[in-house]
C-alpha cells in the first residue's frame, strides 16, 4: 500500500486547510490569484474524494481507509479516521459543493476576498473531519472548529442582519455542543474509551448503561444533532442564517452543515442507544411530521425567495428524520439518499437565488414577474431544480421521498399520509413561487434589461442539473453503497439482538457498525438460505437471529468469514467491569453533570440572549 493510499483520508481532510495557508501568504491585492488557488485546492480535494468513492468496496463490512495513531495517553484520545457508505456519501457531497461555492463567489465577493476564501477552505476541512472521525473527542473537535469559519462567513459577508444571524447560529449550536460534550464524558466514564468502535463493543458486551442513563445520554446527543438538522422546534436559527449568509455560505450550510445533524443521529444516537431510540421514536416521528407540514406552510407565505428556500429545508430534512426513526430499511435508505439529494437540489436553489440577487439586489418575489422572457436560460435551470425539490419522478428528489413514504406506511399509515401531504404542499409553494417570478407580465422596468446566465453560471448550473438527473434516473450506484450500513443499523436496533457473551468465548466476526450478530444456538441450518440481514425464525415463527456476511474478523479469531449466525447468550449485569473500576471516583463525571445542567438552563434562554432590536420575521 502506497503512503498516499494509507493516508488518503488525512490528505483529503487537510488539503483544503493547506490551501487556506497558501492563500494566507498571498498579498491582499492579488484577488485573482487567491480565487484560483482556492479553486485549485477545492478541485484537488474533490478529485481525491471521487477516487475514494470509486475505490470504496460496497461488499466489505466495517470502516474502510482506516487511519489510527495515538494522540493523547490520558485521557486516551486517538487520531482515528475511517469511512463507510454513510460518511463516504457526505464527504463526496462536501468535496462536490465546495469548488462550486468558490465559483459562485467568483464575482460577488470583492470585499476582503482573501479572508473569505481562507474561511471557506477551513470550513471544508472541518466538515470533512466531522464525517471521517471515529474518535468521539476528534469528532467533537471538528464539530466545534467548523463553527468558527461559518460564523465569520455570515458575520462579515452577510447582509443587513448578519451579526444577529451569526450570533444566533453560534448560540444554538453551542448549547447542543455542551450537551454532546457532557454525553461524551459520561460515555468515557462508563466504557473507558473515546474510540467509537470500542465504545460500541463495550456497550454491547458489558451492558454498561442503565435504561435511565441511556435515555439521558440519547437526549444529550439527540438535542445536539436536532439543533443542527434543524428539527422542529429547534429550527428558528436556520431562516436567519440562510437569509443573511452570502450565497456560498447558504450553499454549504444547506448542502453539508445541516447533514451533520442527520449524520450524527445515524452514527451515534441509533447505534449507541438503540433502546432509547426505540422509546423516543414515536415522539421524534411526530416532531418530524410537524416540521414537514409547518415548514411547508410557512414557506408558502414567505415574501422573500431565499427565506422560502430556507423553510423548504426544514420540511425536507423532516423527511430525513422521519425515515430514520420509523426503523424500516427502505425508509432509512431513503433518508440517507434524501440527505445527499437535498444537498444538491437545495444547494442549486440557493445558487440560483444568489445569481438573481446579484442582478437585482433584492429577493422579494413581488419585485419580479415575467423573467422567463428576459432570462430564458436561467428560468429553464430554475424550473428543473424546482421540480427536483418538488420530487418529480426521474429527478433526484423523488427517490428518497418515495422510499421514506413507503417505509413510513409499513410502520404507521398516518406517518405516510402526512409525509405525502408534505410533498403536495412542497409542490404548491415552490411552483407558485416559480409562477410569480417567471411568468406573467413584466411589471418592473428594471427586469427588462437583466442579463441572462454567463458561461461561469451556465457551467455551475449545468453540473448541478446533470447530477440531479443522474441521481433520479439511476440511483442504484448510490443505494448499493449504503446497503450494509442500513443492515447493520437495523440489526443494532433490534432490542433482543444484543450479544452478551462470556468473556471466555472466542472472538466473533464483525459486520459494520454492529460487531456481533445473533445465531441459531441449536445449530440448525435454515433452508432456504436467508439473505444477509434477513431474520431467521424457527418453525414456530419465533425470530432467533439475523444472518450477516462477515468479511472481517477480530484479531486472532481464526473465524471463517463465511455467512454465519452468531450465538447470543445473556450475561450477568455488569460483566466486563474490569475495564474500569466502577467504584473509583472519576474527576470527569462532575464536569459532565455540570455541563448538562448548564446546557439545560441555556437552551430555553438562548433566544432571549440575542439583541431584541434585531428580531423579526416568522419563526
Predicted regions, residues:
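Transmembrane helix-loop-helix hairpins at membrane boundaries of multipass inner-membrane proteins
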Residues: 1-8, 25-118, 193-203, 208, ...
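N-terminal signal-anchor/start-transfer transmembrane helix
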Residues: 11-28, 230
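Hydrophobic transmembrane alpha-helices and their helix-loop junctions in integral membrane proteins
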Residues: 100-108, 125-137, 150-433
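Glycine-biased, low-complexity coil/linker segments
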Residues: 522-523, 532-535, 540, 574-577, ...
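Hydrophobic alpha-helical membrane-insertion segments
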Residues: 40-55, 173-185, 388, 424, ...
